[in-house]
Amino acid sequence: MHWLRTVAALREQVADWRGSTVGLVPTMGSLHEGHLSLIRRCRQECDHTVVSIFVNPLQFGPNEDWDRYPRDEEGDRALCEAAGVDVVFAPDPQEMGADPATGSDRTWVMPPESLLQTLCAPHRPGHFRGVATIVLQLLNLVQPQRAYFGQKDAQQLAIIQRLVRDLQIPTTIVPCSTVREADGLACSSRNRYLSAAERQVAAGLYRALRRGYDHWQAGDPSAEGILAAARAELEHTPELQLQYLELVDPQTLQPLPRVEDKGLLAIAAYVGQTRLIDNLLLSPEQGDPLPERVQHAAPPSSGTTSPPRRPLIAIDGPAGAGKSTVARAVAAQLQLLYLDTGAMYRAITWLALQRGIPLDDAEQLTQLAAQTQLTLQSGTSSTEPTRIWADGEEITQAIRSPEVTRWVSHVAAVPGVRQELVKRQRSIGRDGGAVLEGRDIGTHVFPDAELKVFLTASVGERAQRRQHQLQAQGQMVPLEELKAQIEQRDRRDSERLISPLRPAPDAILIDTDHLSQSEVQDKIVMLYRQLLERSGPARLDQ
């Protein structure tokens, strides 16, 4: 992946892609699942993916949050690399001619006045002028065939679509569905501002929209009825400071007296000091705006051929059976994504220990798992462990300490923690083409994984392996002590009520006691290739 900061470097890179399909995903960084869904869609439909990361000062007002807008370059870099992005363009304001110190002395792109009469525009004067200026600048620099925007920013989407059409820019603007948390809250970088209590209040935006949507679904297309239903729901959340609640045409953004064909029900409100926006499209073709679980980006439009889905490999087994080492090596050989689920549980355990959270306080542990942003990046080689960041701080080495090892199975047994992390694991692995290892991947996280492997080894063998790992880190722990710890952890893992350690009924058992790491790796690779021969999915290019 190339991380570029200058226009010259970007132009040089893009010039090498002549004749290929290039996709652009414009962002302001602090990436979350919403951005990742755009990136996944782009990678499915284009030969090359460019992600721009630019906190655009031109779209912030004098009293807005440009200075404190969340920035996480290290985490963004890791996420983009893991997602398979080809180029990240991350210029500074001076490079884009958007230095706040120069004021208004530059060329601006002015959106049509008719698109600035409703929704956010009256409350944020100049905002969409700044958005349009930088987006068109990016389109000119990258010259993509396709550019991907989220439906959550519906007014921005409508303005960009109109400008591209009016100026005859040869780029297809691809709208992508809003990605939501389980309670309906739309993913947003500004969600990071919210406290735990504010996070619960914020879910009221979606509930209000959903109430209006359900009213429309029940047969009343009038704006009066739809808006009244949404306002009635807002009365249950008085902490929300409503800025606007409007029903408009999705393309013209003009107010609608009733929904004849399509409508956009949009809301903006303050939760404490944080301004949040959201919307739902009222359209017979749209379908339910939120199924029971998190809704990810819409599938590619008709006529687009997506790459065939590659199988998932689920590797389970007890601590010390060699899962992580083997999984990394298999993923590297087969050119698959490697997801170290154990590192996620270790990260929450380490954070709990650092913050003094009692490990028997399930509520606090669950809240910690829900609020912590975890970023994982595969090592540069099959022998390098997964790098992991928690809220922007790298903790790769810290989570491998004996203290974390001692308590991680205790934290992993907390139902709320497992629920939060499993949700993230499923999000990452849902498109296939990944190797996941843990203790319940094949039985709980991905019970439909195409290839399930359960690695075993004796307690003595696993203790020796762990001792060698610790010695390499300069730590000396007696072998008998390690055996006792492993036996205790085996009992906890196998006896816990939630997702106990056990092989899936269709898992292939491999005893690693007398096998080298490369021999175990070869067995799994052979099983994978046999699976491909039987099912005929995507060809492997290795």
UniProtKB/Swiss-Prot annotation:
Region (Disordered): 287-311
SUPFAM superfamilies: Nucleotidylyl transferase (SSF52374), P-loop containing nucleoside triphosphate hydrolases (SSF52540)
A single BP term in Gene Ontology: pyrimidine nucleotide metabolic process
Region described as Pantoate--beta-alanine ligase: 1-280
Tree of life domain: Bacteria
GO cellular component term, pick one: cytosol
Span list, region Cytidylate kinase: 281-542
Protein residues bound to (R)-pantoate: Q59, Q156
GO molecular function terms attached to this record: ATP binding; CMP kinase activity; dCMP kinase activity; pantoate-beta-alanine ligase activity
Active-site residues from the entry: H35
Pfam families linked to this entry: Cytidylate_kin, Pantoate_ligase
Family: In the N-terminal section; belongs to the pantothenate synthetase family.
Protein function: Catalyzes the condensation of pantoate with beta-alanine in an ATP-dependent reaction via a pantoyl-adenylate intermediate.
NCBIfam families: cmk, cyt_tran_rel, panC, PRK13477.1
UniProt protein name: Bifunctional pantoate ligase/cytidylate kinase
Record organism: Synechococcus sp. (strain JA-2-3B'a(2-13)) (Cyanobacteria bacterium Yellowstone B-Prime)
